[in-house]
From Swiss-Prot:
Annotated segments matching region Disordered: 18-97, 171-195
Subunit structure: Interacts with gex-3.
Summary of the knockout phenotype: No visible phenotype.
Polar residues: compositionally biased ranges: 58-79
Superkingdom of the organism of origin: Eukaryota
Binding locations of Zn(2+) 1: C212, C215, H230, H235
Protein name as annotated: Gex-3-interacting protein 13
Keywords: Metal-binding, Repeat, Zinc, Zinc-finger
Zinc finger (BED-type): 194-242, 424-473
InterPro entries per the UniProt record, alphabetical: Znf_BED, Znf_C2H2_sf
Originating organism: Caenorhabditis elegans
Record's keyword annotation contains Cell membrane: no
Any one GO BP annotation for this protein: negative regulation of transcription elongation by RNA polymerase II
Gene: gei-13
Listed GO CC annotations: NELF complex
Amino acid sequence: MTDCSSTLAALLPTADFTASLGNSDDHVDVSSFTTTSESTSPPYSSSEHHSPTDQRTETPTSDSGNASFSPENVATSFESSDRDASPDNLSTSSAHLNDLQEKGVVVDEELQRQLLRFHQDFKESLMENNQNTINMMSAAFNQQLFKQTLANLNTVTPQLPVNIPTGLPMPASPCTTAASAPSVESTPTKRKRQRRNPVWPYFDVIDGTARCKQCLYSTKSVFSTNLKVHLRSHHRPDYEKVIMAEDALNLNALLLSGNTSKLFNVDANRKRMPPMTSSILMTINKLANQQQNGEENPLNAVLRQTIANNGLQQHLQNVQTQLQAAQAAVQKQQQQQQQQQIQQQQQQQQQGAIPQFALNAANLAALNQLARNQMQPTPPPVPQVSQDNIINTLNFPAHIKQEIMNAPHGTDANGVPQPKRRRLRRHPVWVYFKDLEDRMVGCTNCEFRTGSAFSTNLKMHLKAHHKDDYEKVLQLEEEMRLEEGCFGPGNKFKTELIDYIRGGGNVTTPPTPNSSSFPSTPKTPQLVQQIISQSFARSQSPNVIQNGEIKIKKECEDDMFSGLSSTDKLAALVGIAGQEVKKEEAMPANFEEFRQRLLANSSLSSFLGQSTAQPIAVDLNGSVIASETKSPCSSNEDDRKQERDKALARLWADNETLLTNTHFREFVHCLAPEYEIPDVDILATSLVDQY
């Protein structure tokens, strides 16, 4: 390209150009021709145009061609221009200026400079923006001249600028706009990522989405690790193939790198070992197993060649030697630990065998008793009452006996599984009851059901509805008590007395025959009759003397029924007024008199923890009544038991075989049924505390 004059001469004929300038109206916007602004610069004058992408930053002004052409606007455009008004900016070609002068074009000097500057800006904008060029040409020339200008542009091939740093030519078309899409040559090419992982053959990557070739799985996270996770979860055989291929590649790379010593160096630092070592060893084991089974794997050839070239056989021998040494050290350590554990156990057993206690009288007595028990022969085993014996003894119906015998362990008679109960059902009352669903218990003789599965409640049911079965249960209880060593009956007197009072029995009333609608009158026991008769006789006389030993006042006898309610007192005294008082014999009439006589003895009273000076009486409820207080004794049960233990300890100190005497145990049980004879250790401790 030449200067601006040559450009005008090449684009327009001289006559047309002069006529267009002379015939232009006052409304032509000259500012639309000038594109000089603070944001505009020559395409080759700054470093902003060194890259091809910088040419897309220019945008056409939205207000071009809108302002009117006037001298004020021309002057304003001259003043606002950032170019120097000196003649240095003018073209040095004087030939074209002479041509203009020869053709008689008379213009002002300032207007001439404006025209030259316009042509220079036109040349620059022609290379930068096609849209601005079209706007300027459409505003400056008529349609005829615009067509001619386009024809001249087609014939002239402009010289393309060259980007100096890159050496790439600028875009060939000067008509590219900012809105148009950039060309392929102008955008830098993105380096394609290498996909060397063997997982990629199982996936297709389309538009940044990886799709599995075997199922409908797709993901935008196009990474080999995620794809391997999919194969591991849904295509296990392919996943194993990928892992084996990865291991082969890693092993080959590791061996070719010359770092084979790190592969089998057990003592080396783990951080320096490659992360795929464990996986490689697993692959080697798999390949070895395949070779033993007669299967040939294509990776075996690679391994054999690598081992032959790099001499891994020696490394394997070293590894085996190190492993054997490590195993020997581990076995030796395990043997030492076992020996230490055995020694500790022996020491603990020896310490547990030696009793650690002080040498005092209580401990010596306990040791003596322990030695005697070991020297005495063991008593013969007492036969236990089994369920079969009870069932055979009692007369059950055939169907009930069959259900009881056929019921498996953990189920009821109906075969329903039952949860394991904590309580042992050794009481004979359970022969008449069976387990039902929902932890219920049912009677085998009727439709009675209850959730309170306790032997006492079940006995009350038998007592109220099945008298014969209740008597059998009481008989079996007595037999079991004797066989288990619980000598003597229970509190039979109190039980019979309570049953008699609640039943409303009368001493003089004979028992009536049973009827279907009314229950029978309970039979009066002989012991209860004697107690009632003696109580009536004492109430008639103010003082009753028995063998001159114990004096019981009338006031004390009046309080014997203080523990009973009014209804129970009336029930107990029914028919007593017509009873004749029997003459007392030399022998005691009942057990209570015998007990009171025994209490008079000083040694026995001290044994029972009671004083001899204070008279003692017992009411119908079994409560001890003192004559002075006329109320039940308020002594603490624990204190009484301690006093009894001390007295028994003194007797045991005089005769050490006292506790093993069966008659002495029966005697103590008769005196105090509620008192339990303590062990030898407790008696020895009580004896030491006394002294």
